[in-house]
Design a protein with these regions (language model features):
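N-terminal leader/targeting pre-sequences
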Residues: 2-137
Length: 137
């Protein structure tokens, strides 16, 4: 769940999510500006291959990933890939792990670290799925 969300200056917001579950550890950093969000991630001990990567609606961990509910979707769009014209705001595509590590960066529209935005990720769950995402296909 993104925490430590701060306004770095008058131009952008920044959030950090620490991952530490079932021996999978890592960090996901979000930086948002003008309705675009850049996500940098570094994950360790993740099985090799593609894994769906999403922001889910709720940050409730009481029942593990199940309590996170569906993908974050404030505009009620269909599921898609991170660069699809029509997509859930929380659709971040797939990350690829090799040698049990995954790191990279992605920039998407319609996500924000601003807690006042309808597209805010603050308090939501970040999930790295065991299986690949179909990107809405």
């Amino acid at each position: 769940m993104p925490n430590n969300c701060t306004k770095k200056n008058k131009k952008y917001y920044h959030c950090i999510s620490i991952i530490d579950m079932n021996n999978i550890k890592g960090i996901v950093k979000f930086k948002s500006y003008n309705n675009k969000c850049t996500i940098n991630y570094k994950i360790k001990n993740l099985s090799n291959g593609k894994h769906g990567f999403h922001v889910h609606k709720h940050g409730d961990l009481s029942q593990g990933c199940t309590s996170g509910c569906e993908h974050f979707n404030p505009d009620n769009h269909e599921h898609g890939g991170p660069h699809s014209k029509i997509r859930h705001a929380g659709d971040l595509g797939n990350i690829i792990s090799s040698n049990k590590e995954s790191f990279g960066s992605i920039t998407v529209n319609n996500l924000s670290c601003n807690p006042k935005s309808k597209c805010s990720i603050v308090g939501r769950m970040i999930i790295i799925h065991e299986d690949p995402d179909d990107l809405g296909k």
